[in-house]
A protein has these predicted regions:
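HIT superfamily nucleotide-processing domains
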Residues: 1-149
Length: 149
């Protein structure tokens, strides 16, 4: 199993590290406490913001525990600012962890939403468990992995 990466240095190959350092241009909305939030270059909707830790973390597992609350507190503030500043009716807040993560630097998407905007909940089809036993088996396997640390 690959070990997640968290470094106190910025990665020269990482576009988000380049944005944080100022080497790559971006529309920054806020920089504070080791975090940077900027407009997504390929937004779902105009005003789509990415919130990133300044230090390189490949994914959520790589971010030290002390960094989790500040990251999501800023994402919450950005969501509120999007509602007030852009007259959005809400926000979609999400993290892709490895799969569908287009840039291997942890980032929280904060996407403005309005009723009837065409975005229909999640981007993937829903499924069902074949039985209560199968559902409980999944719950047990996850609980066991959590207990194992």
């Amino acid at each position: 199993m690959e070990t997640p990466t968290y470094t106190s240095r910025m990665s020269k190959a990482c576009v988000f590290c380049s944005i944080v350092s100022g080497a790559e241009p971006a529309s920054i909305v806020v920089r504070e406490d080791g975090l940077t939030a900027f407009l997504d270059a390929r937004p779902v909707f105009k005003g789509h913001v990415l919130v990133v830790p300044d230090m390189h973390a490949d994914d959520l597992a790589a971010l030290p525990a002390a960094g989790i609350a500040p990251l999501f507190l800023l994402a919450r503030r950005v969501a509120a600012a999007i509602e007030h500043g852009l007259a959005a009716q809400g926000a979609f807040v999400a993290v892709n962890n490895k799969i569908s993560q287009s840039v291997p630097h942890l980032h929280v998407h904060v996407v403005p939403r309005t009723k009837g905007d065409g975005l229909r909940g999640f981007f993937w089809p829903r499924t069902k468990y074949g039985s209560d036993d199968e559902r409980e088996s999944y719950a047990r396997r996850i609980a066991d992995a959590l207990a194992a640390g």
